[in-house]
């Protein structure tokens, strides 16, 4: 299965952005703080071990995440930095094969392939076969051969 990609959304999938108090007013005020403060939604030690196993088996592990709907160039840069830092803090041992942080609303099925874990039903519907809800991440990774 070489080069088969396993893609993870961040917000609402591995990072609990929507549980950060006042996240929406902060994003609307061009404040990237919620992206940095979001708590992990998984046991990150176990998740990292399974990602390493996937890579040893020949799979690529990737991030495909949107920027904020509230957007300008400076804010997009700040959000990108916050998301990259979040990954370094919570998954420091993972060497991602690809990280795509793209404009809000970018059709993910047009910029990535393989499987997708995403909390947004529309993204999963557009992706088609191989799209999963976040609650299926660990079971999927444990089943890789």
Locations of regions flagged by a protein language model:
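Alpha-helical substrate-recognition element adjacent to the catalytic core
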Residues: 5-7, 11-86, 90
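Short, flexible active-site-adjacent loop segments at beta-strand->alpha-helix junctions, enriched
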Residues: 18, 67, 105, 120-121
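Short, solvent-exposed polar/charged micro-motifs at secondary-structure junctions
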Residues: 73-74, 107-115, 142-143
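Acidic, Mg2+-coordinating phosphoryl-transfer loop and its flanking beta/alpha structural elements
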Residues: 114-145
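A general structural motif
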Residues: 1-3, 58, 113
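Donor nucleotide-activated moiety binding/catalytic core segment of transferases
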Residues: 84, 93-114
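Conserved beta-strand termini and adjacent loop/short-helix elements that scaffold enzyme active sites
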Residues: 64, 101-104, 134-135
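Structural alpha-beta junctions
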Residues: 57-58, 88-98, 128-134
């Amino acid at each position: 299965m070489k080069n088969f990609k396993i893609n993870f959304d961040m917000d609402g999938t591995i990072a609990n952005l929507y549980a950060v108090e006042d996240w929406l007013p902060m994003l609307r005020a061009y404040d990237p703080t919620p992206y940095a403060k979001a708590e992990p939604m998984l046991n990150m030690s176990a998740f990292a071990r399974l990602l390493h196993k996937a890579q040893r088996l020949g799979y690529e592990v990737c991030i495909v995440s949107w920027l904020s709907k509230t957007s300008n160039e400076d804010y997009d840069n700040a959000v990108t930095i916050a998301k990259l830092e979040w990954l370094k803090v919570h998954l420091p041992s993972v060497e991602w094969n690809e990280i795509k942080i793209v404009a809000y609303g970018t059709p993910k099925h047009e910029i990535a392939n393989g499987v997708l874990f995403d909390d947004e039903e529309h993204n999963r519907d557009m992706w088609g076969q191989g799209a999963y809800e976040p609650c299926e991440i660990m079971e999927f990774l444990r089943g890789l051969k």
